[in-house]
Amino acid sequence: RTLRRFQIAPGVHLSYDAAQKFNRCRISIHFAFPARRETATAHALLPLVMERGYADCPDMTQMTKKLARLYGADLTVDARPMGCSHNLCVSITGIKDQFALEGEKLTQEYAALALGTAFHPYFVGSTFDPEAVGIEKQMLKKALEDEVNDKRLYCQRQANRAPPASGRRAT
């Protein structure tokens, strides 16, 4: 495997794997920034809002159509804590150019979509679309309430979050 990783800005990396044995390719852009309690809600909402669209493709319907035209490419925006940092990953997966029926340059379109999502989000004025943020906030709140109500899942997640006071993880 030939995984290549390029820093395209401080704390921002582009990863590229030129493996020939697969018929699909993936482009990922990773952002790393300090994890802070006071920004936890914003960090949880950010990928949900970013996945809805970007400046050149501002809504979910347009985004879905664009991905369908790219032979069902898949765009994901994911965020997760990694030690003392928070990692945001914008990733797109789709078929390689050589499998395009009409010779389309799909990889260029994948890169444009990933870069647009990462660096040119859809703003209303100078902020994310308040309607999209409100919808995603409600959906996230419901998901968290559902998790708390699912006692078994809630206990599992709490057990995996922090070690007991003795410093040893329960088994």
Predicted segments, located by residue:
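Short, Gly/Pro- and small/polar-rich lid/capping loops
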Residues: 1-11
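Active-site SXXK
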Residues: 44-51
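M16 family metallopeptidases and their MPP-like homologs
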Residues: 15-17, 23-38, 43, 60-120, ...
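Generic secondary-structure boundary/loop-capping signal
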Residues: 11, 72-74, 130
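Short, polar/flexible loop-turn hinges at active-site or ligand-entry regions and domain interfaces
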Residues: 53-56, 98-101, 120-129
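Conserved phosphate/pyrophosphate-binding and hydrolysis machinery centered on Walker-type P-loop NTPases
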Residues: 130-133, 149
